[in-house]
Amino acid sequence: MANLKEIRDRIVSVKNTRKITEAMRLVAAAKVRRAQDQVLKSRPFADKLARVLENIQSRVQFEAVDSPLLSKREVKSISLVCITADRGLCGGYNTNIIKKVEIRYAELVKQGYQPNLILVGKKAIGYFQNRKDRYAIKSTFKELEQVPTVKDSEGVTNEILAEFLSENSDRVEIIYTKFITLVSCAPVVQTLLPLDPQGIAEENDEIFRLTTKDSKLLVEKSNIEKSDSEKLPSDIVFEQSPDQLLDSLLPLYLQNQVLRALQESAASELACRMTAMNNASDNAKELASTLNLTYNKARQAAITQEILEVVGGSAV
């Protein structure tokens, strides 16, 4: 059995680790809230933009409009945009999205394509750069804001547009982690280009807030009710032609889709980190309890041994 000092040192170490994981859990919880706020703040613009596109769509057939972002040409090459985190300590978040990319990449190779990868996040960059012999990497992006902004999405969007408009890629897919609930998220594959605008569907979002109870910080959940979008008047007169309008609006729509994917991924990362740190805190608490029990047993055994030695010495 380990000596008392070793056990005592381990107990102190575990308790200190628990303080760190608990702090990281609370920080992640606060940042999840910020990430969700960012999504809600950007939604009015995205929703209005979708309404304008729907209005134009109701007047003309997109298929008849000469816009390069809507053109569906023969698919010869495909680009995959992969969004991961820059950091770890977030459970299986990075592993799950990388596995999804590998599966999709293998499917496309089996179909006869040679996909290019556009990587976002240090974890994806590090993983696939170590396997350059198996994966073709086109470009990389890292060190984005933890709560993504429009500026963060610009670089990724411009790279996607350059690939598609230069016909280096005939289709662009984005693979990111969709935020479902605080304890549930899932990697998804979405086609970005060619665009097929169908409007922005609002969901019954869950919002998480930090609260206090019995002098402890907790996280509570509430729901944001789905709002009814205001329809644009059907008699709006557009001065520009549909081609000119779409050439201006579709890149904005694409950038909004990229931003939404970045924001969902950020919220998922933070939620996974919060869950992972919560589990780590629980494990640390359980381990500390086990070590305390071991320490008490060792201490009791040492005291018993000393008593026996004293009694034995007296008998002599």
Swiss-Prot record:
Gene3D superfamilies reported in the protein's UniProt record: 3.40.1380.10, ATP synthase, gamma subunit, helix hairpin domain (1.10.287.80)
How is the protein disposed in the membrane?
Answer: Peripheral membrane protein
Q: Which GO molecular function, any one, fits this protein according to its record? A: proton-transporting ATP synthase activity, rotational mechanism
Gene Ontology cellular-component terms listed: plasma membrane-derived thylakoid membrane; proton-transporting ATP synthase complex
Q: Which InterPro entries match?
A: ATP_synth_F1_ATPase_gsu, ATP_synth_F1_gsu
Q: Which domain of life is it from?
A: Bacteria
Q: Where does it live in the cell?
A: Cellular thylakoid membrane
Q: What is its main location?
A: membrane
Q: Which UniProt keywords apply?
A: ATP synthesis, CF(1), Hydrogen ion transport, Ion transport, Membrane, Thylakoid, Transport
Q: What does this protein do?
A: Produces ATP from ADP in the presence of a proton gradient across the membrane. The gamma chain is believed to be important in regulating ATPase activity and the flow of protons through the CF(0) complex.
Subunit-structure text: F-type ATPases have 2 components, CF(1) - the catalytic core - and CF(0) - the membrane proton channel. CF(1) has five subunits: alpha(3), beta(3), gamma(1), delta(1), epsilon(1). CF(0) has three main subunits: a, b and c.
Q: Which family does it belong to?
A: Belongs to the ATPase gamma chain family.
From the Swiss-Prot or TrEMBL record, give the protein name.
ATP synthase gamma chain
Q: Which species is listed as the source?
A: Prochlorococcus marinus (strain AS9601)
What broad taxonomic lineage does this protein's source fall under?
A: Bacteria, Bacillati, Cyanobacteriota, Cyanophyceae, Synechococcales
